[in-house]
Each structure stands twice: as structure tokens, then as C-alpha cells.
């Protein structure tokens, strides 16, 4: 199992992601810097959270236009699994690899707390080890996590079962349409989500609900 983590100036959750991937696979992930125009053969590419390029212009706007993101695009088109968490999700949206956009939280405040998620679709490589309707706990930490998409695209996403996670039990922290917390592309190999499953891997960190997410994605990619 080979994994790679994209590194951009301002991304600050890469060490958390390294720890999570190493915990699941037992192998240290490759670290790919922003200026790289090619990515070695890997099974999974992860874009972690943070504030790439200081969130100038828009969150993820500059990061989406780096050489390494073009390399990510090429890998994704070949079916490689791509995961974007928080700012990584914002970058994938800016790059056009996922539908929709992320706006300022409706509270206009940075939100950092644990929230509840409902697992909506378990027929994906990212959620197959969960149970449909399962409620899991996961932390969030963002200022611009309010997911929005036009009504026609939203209808298509619902029909295509592209929504994997929803905020549950009235814990929507940002005002996202239809409580959407995590989505995939039509092909099912690209995922973006605002919550941080990498922070809930070990009991000492407060929970283990994120472990099944990585086991689902990494073991299926390997297979």
C-alpha cells in the first residue's frame, strides 16, 4: 500500500495525516511538494487540511492552481483514489474535481468542536466498513465550510448517491445545504469532506470513529 500526502505552504494538518496513514498501513506516506509536476505510482493521494497560501483570494484557490494539483488531476483521471480533508476539500472544489463550493460559515465564526455525522452511503470505497445510518463522531475546525451547490446539481448528486456523510443530530456547524459534510465524484474515486477523521484514530485522541474511514479507503485501494 503506497500513499502520498500533498504539501502546500500553509497546510498544517499533514503531520496528523501522516500519523493516521502510518497507523493504518504501517508504511510512511510519501510527501509531495507543491512544485512537483509528477507523482510516483501510489494507491491513495491525500490533500490535508490547513490554510494553503493563507486562504488568499478564496480558500483553496491558489492551491488548486499549483503544478502538483495538475499531477493530482492526472492521477485521479486514471482512477487513483484522492482524498481532500477540510482545506483539501476546498482545493478539490476549486480544481473542479468535485461539484459545488464552500462558503463562509453562516455564524461568520471559526468553528472548532466535535460534531455528529450520519453515514448516508456505505456503497463506496470510503465508507464500506460503516453501517448505513450509523452515527459517528468527528471533529471539525474551519471558517469556510458552508457547502453549497445549485438545486439541479444537488438533485443529480442525490440520485447518484454522491453524498456520503451528513451532519447529524442538529450539529451542522456551518449551514451546509442538506447538512452535507462529505461527497464523492461520479466515478467514486475522489472524496472531499470538512470533518477530520484523521484526528479520531486512537482512543487517546478522544475517539476511533475515523479509523473505519481509512481502513475502508486504504484496504480497498490496495485490493
UniProtKB/Swiss-Prot annotation:
Part of the phosphoribosylformylglycinamidine synthase complex involved in the purines biosynthetic pathway. Catalyzes the ATP-dependent conversion of formylglycinamide ribonucleotide (FGAR) and glutamine to yield formylglycinamidine ribonucleotide (FGAM) and glutamate. The FGAM synthase complex is composed of three subunits. PurQ produces an ammonia molecule by converting glutamine to glutamate. PurL transfers the ammonia molecule to FGAR to form FGAM in an ATP-dependent manner. The active site is at residues 86, 196, 198. GO terms for molecular function: ATP binding; glutaminase activity; phosphoribosylformylglycinamidine synthase activity. GO terms for biological process: 'de novo' IMP biosynthetic process. Pfam families: GATase_5. Residues 2-223 form the Glutamine amidotransferase type-1 domain. The gene is purQ. Part of the FGAM synthase complex composed of 1 PurL, 1 PurQ and 2 PurS subunits. The lineage of its organism: Bacteria, Pseudomonadati, Pseudomonadota, Alphaproteobacteria, Hyphomicrobiales. GO terms for cellular component: cytoplasm. Disulfide bonds: none annotated. NCBIfam families: FGAM_synth_I, PRK03619.1. It is found in: Cytoplasm. This is Phosphoribosylformylglycinamidine synthase subunit PurQ.
Amino acid at each position: 500500500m503506497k500513499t502520498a500526502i500533498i504539501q502546500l505552504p500553509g497546510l498544517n494538518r499533514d503531520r496528523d495525516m501522516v500519523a493516521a496513514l502510518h497507523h493504518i498501513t504501517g508504511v510512511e506516506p510519501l510527501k509531495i511538494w507543491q512544485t512537483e509536476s509528477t507523482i510516483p505510482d501510489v494507491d491513495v493521494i491525500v490533500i490535508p487540511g490547513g490554510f494553503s497560501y493563507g486562504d488568499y483570494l478564496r480558500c483553496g484557490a491558489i492551491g488548486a492552481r499549483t503544478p502538483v494539483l495538475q499531477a493530482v488531476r492526472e492521477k485521479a483521471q486514471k482512477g487513483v483514489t484522492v482524498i481532500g480533508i477540510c482545506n483539501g476539500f476546498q482545493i478539490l472544489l476549486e480544481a473542479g474535481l468535485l461539484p459545488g463550493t464552500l462558503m463562509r460559515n453562516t455564524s461568520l465564526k471559526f468553528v472548532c468542536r466535535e460534531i455528529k455525522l450520519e453515514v448516508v452511503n456505505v456503497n463506496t470505497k470510503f465508507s464500506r466498513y460503516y453501517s448505513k445510518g450509523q452515527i459517528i463522531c468527528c471533529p471539525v475546525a474551519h471558517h469556510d465550510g458552508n457547502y453549497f451547490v445549485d438545486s439541479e446539481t444537488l438533485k443529480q448528486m442525490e440520485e447518484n448517491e454522491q453524498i456520503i456523510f451528513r451532519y447529524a443530530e442538529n450539529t451542522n456547524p456551518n449551514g451546509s445545504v442538506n447538512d452535507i459534510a462529505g461527497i464523492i465524484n461520479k466515478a467514486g474515486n475522489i472524496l472531499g469532506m470538512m470533518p477530520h477523521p484523521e484526528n479520531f484514530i486512537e482512543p487517546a485522541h478522544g475517539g476511533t470513529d475515523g479509523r473505519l474511514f481509512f481502513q475502508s479507503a486504504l484496504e480497498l485501494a490496495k485490493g
